[in-house]
Amino acid sequence: MKNLTDSFVYLGHWPAAGSFGFNTDILATNPINLSVVFGVLIFFGKGVLNDLLDNRKQRILNTIRNSEELREGAIQQLENARARLRKVEAEADQFRVNGYSEIEREKLNLINSTSKTLKQLENYKNETILVEQQRTINQVRERIFQQALQGAIGTLNSCLSNELHLRTINANIGMFGTMKKITD
């Protein structure tokens, strides 16, 4: 017991500054106290520490498991996206090919339609020209006929007298009458 009280006395007494020494008193250096504290901490803290480590381990494993599931899901989505991309690219190529062939077909149809329309317009133009030529020719003929008729009437009026007119008219009426009898 005396050692115990001496250790308390030594705790209250500090060596003077500048001195350095080795303390051989085991109780004064507290290795026993420290070992008891460490033993208690290890004994009671072991379960808590194990629980903490187990919880941490489970969280890490769950995180890894979730990460793996997410990775697999992401890989599946990536594969699906790649498949859709290939499908869309194939459809785009098909549309492009169909579009080019459709454009060529429409171009040929437009060329053919335009050519046909131009031929029809050319025919209409030619027909219009022919009709106008015929109308002009008929007008010229009519004009010439009227001028010739007026000239003939003028000549007849100047050359023939009234008596000659009457005899010519009577002769013509007689011819018409004879022709009528023949036809009846």
From Swiss-Prot:
Transmembrane segments: 27-49
Keyword annotations: ATP synthesis, CF(0), Chloroplast, Hydrogen ion transport, Ion transport, Membrane, Plastid, Thylakoid, Transmembrane, Transmembrane helix, Transport
GO molecular function: proton-transporting ATP synthase activity, rotational mechanism
Coarse class of the protein's main subcellular location: plastid
The organism's place on the tree of life at top rank: Eukaryota
Keyword field contains Thylakoid: yes
GO CC terms of this entry: chloroplast thylakoid membrane; proton-transporting ATP synthase complex
UniProt-annotated location(s): Plastid, Chloroplast thylakoid membrane
InterPro entries on file: ATP_synth_b/b'su_bac/chlpt (IPR002146)
Topology of the protein relative to the lipid bilayer: Single-pass membrane protein
Additional observations: In plastids the F-type ATPase is also known as CF(1)CF(0).
Its biological purpose: F(1)F(0) ATP synthase produces ATP from ADP in the presence of a proton or sodium gradient. F-type ATPases consist of two structural domains, F(1) containing the extramembraneous catalytic core and F(0) containing the membrane proton channel, linked together by a central stalk and a peripheral stalk. During catalysis, ATP synthesis in the catalytic domain of F(1) is coupled via a rotary mechanism of the central stalk subunits to proton translocation. Component of the F(0) channel, it forms part of the peripheral stalk, linking F(1) to F(0).
UniProt record similarity statement: Belongs to the ATPase B chain family.
Self-association and partners: F-type ATPases have 2 components, F(1) - the catalytic core - and F(0) - the membrane proton channel. F(1) has five subunits: alpha(3), beta(3), gamma(1), delta(1), epsilon(1). F(0) has four main subunits: a(1), b(1), b'(1) and c(10-14). The alpha and beta chains form an alternating ring which encloses part of the gamma chain. F(1) is attached to F(0) by a central stalk formed by the gamma and epsilon chains, while a peripheral stalk is formed by the delta, b and b' chains.
Protein name: ATP synthase subunit b, chloroplastic
Species the sequence originates in: Lobularia maritima (Sweet alyssum)
